[in-house]
C-alpha cells in the first residue's frame, strides 16, 4: 500500500512525497527525461544503476541523471516500508538554469555525479527545509511563487553541488543475488 502525501508542480519542476507501507520492489528498470533527486526520510532502499546496487538509508540523497536506467527495491523481505521525497527537474528546465548561471554547469554535474550520498544532520535539515519551502510555495501559490520555487531550487542545487563535489558517492553494495553482482 502507498500514500502520496504531497504532489505539486510548476513547468519543469515537480515534487512528490510518498509513503509506502511494507515491501515494495519495482518490477522493471526504467529511465525518464528528467533529473531525479530522491531523498529518504525513513526506511531504506536498494538502488540499481550501471549494473551495480547501492543501499540508501534514511537521510541519504540519491541523484539520478536524465535517461539513466535505474530501479529500486526493498533491502530485505521484512521491509516495513519507506517515506521518500522526489524532486523531478526536466532537462529543459535544467538547461535553462545553466543558461542563467553557466558556471553552475548543472547538466554536467548530474551526468558526472549521479549516485547515493550520505548527508550529515545539517545537510539533512537543509534538504527538509528546502522541501518544506517548495511544498508551501506550491500549496499557497502566493504572488511570484514560481520565481520563489526557481530561487529555492537554484539555491539548493548550488549548495548540493558544492557538497557532492567534495564527497565521494556510496560504494556499491555486494549482492548475494547473481543477477545483480558487479563484474
Predicted regions and their residues:
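Generic protein-terminus/edge-of-domain signal
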Residues: 1-61, 68, 104, 115
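A hydrophobic/aromatic-rich effector-binding and dimerization subdomain
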Residues: 2-15, 69, 73-136, 162-166
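Short, flexible, glycine/charge-rich loop motifs used to bind or transfer phosphoryl groups or to couple energy/partner
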Residues: 27-28, 52, 75-77, 173
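Broad gene-expression machinery/nucleic-acid interaction feature
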Residues: 36, 83-86, 182
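Short hydrophobic-aromatic micro-motifs
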Residues: 62-64, 87-88
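Hydrophobic packing residues in well-ordered alpha-helices of helical domains and bundles
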Residues: 84, 127, 146-149, 153, ...
